[in-house]
Swiss-Prot record:
It comes from the Viruses. It comes from Rice dwarf virus (isolate Akita) (RDV). Disulfide bonds: none annotated. This is Movement protein. The keyword Membrane does not apply. GO terms for cellular component: host cell cytoplasm; host cell plasmodesma.
Amino acid sequence: MDTETLCLITADSGKVYGILKAIFGDESEIVKKLIDFDVSIRVVPLNLGLLNIFRDNAADLDNADLMKRRFGNTMGSRIVEAYRRSQDSKYKRNVCKTTGLLVCLFGGGLGLSREADKHKKFVEGKSHNILSVEMLKRALSIGGQNVDANKISSFWFATYTIFTTVYSPRLRYQAGSSKRIIALSESRNQYRSNLFWDLRDDSSHEVMSMVHVLSALFASALTAYISTRVAHELTQGNDERESLNNVLVWLKTLTFEPSTIALIAYIWLVSPTDAQATITIGSVMESESSDDFPDIVKILSYTSNTMLPVQLLEDGRTAYCSVADGYTTHTTALTLITDYNSSHMSDKFGVLINIVKFEHAYALHYVHHKPRDGKEMTITSPSSEMMFTSVVVTPLSSYPLIHARNAVIDWLRTFVHMFPDSGSLVIPADSYTWIHNLAQDMFPWVRLSTTLDIRDDHYFQVLCDCLSLEHDSRNHTKVEKLIKYMKASVYNFTSEARGNMLLAITVYK
């Protein structure tokens, strides 16, 4: 997904370049030039909750009483004010003269600071909560910069799923005294899909809250990295204006996968300083044009509070770091070897559950489960003949089998939301590749596990079918029936809804 769909690209003052002092030094002439130039690029995360509210209540946005009843006085008033400003013919966007970007000088909140009216680099305009207005205009506009709320919601839910299953368990190994570490909720698939509901930040809306955290982390990280790109342009002999506009052109060409954003958010969260995080993220962002393996290995530097050393395999082309958690070992690896899913790697590290692909390297995450006291673990699995039956699970197959149920729920929840029209379940031809890639990015370990002896697990089979939609029309029909059967209850994962899904899976196996 491209940057302009994921975020608002705005103009800010030169204070954004403050992070460069820690990278280049306080006396750097480049840093002084940029701060004096006093124009920078800031990436602002879209508020997905507001976007969905705007879209779902499009017919009533001018009804103050109704909006206040639905969302409370503060939120309701904010929505109505944003809508009325967006419809006002006299509404004037504050635009940066240098870049043509929307101005976003941060004051005490998300609106413009009072300094914006006096800033020489920007068109004069009255301070107001401009971000809500711009989000509303994008949510309701036809064409142009219209945000496809279905796809962007699905994208962020995929990012959330990857982050909470791959990276957040590792945060327990970070220094407990660090102020950068925050309480991150694990995925709770038995609760309703809060991502597609409103912006009420309480315990029952943990998914949306986590999406806000991830989008903010990503925006902060990208903003910091952009400042280093501008500094680099300046060293190439360009002036400040040209440097800024060159970076802006580059920024608008970027695309991201959910797994890459999850990785960037994790690095930004756990790195000791913003400056160090920016350098590390640079290794990730620039990997597509560089095969400098030592630079890419830097993303492995912060795995635990003991700063476990990065180790190399015998071939010298694979670096890894492992963290043990009782009967589970998490291993992050970077390799230049294209055959990263070989038996040699699996035997050493366990089940491959996440892949971030670069042009010259692969970032991999493995999980290995060790049976207690050398015994085989058993779990319950739904069956069409018996409601529950005991299935023997080997260490190699335990991860995909245990998580297949949640993966199916996640995937169907994402998939159903992409096609909200209950009267039609026809998948557009140009959506096949996008759907397949999204599912593959969320659950890359499924294909690697298809040879394991776990085919009797109906959830796992449905997930495999989901990942091969474009190859087999029979699988398409099966999943289509599943979605149609579940459509009325898929958003509210009550016990009844879960029972319906279990029945659907057993019936359409």
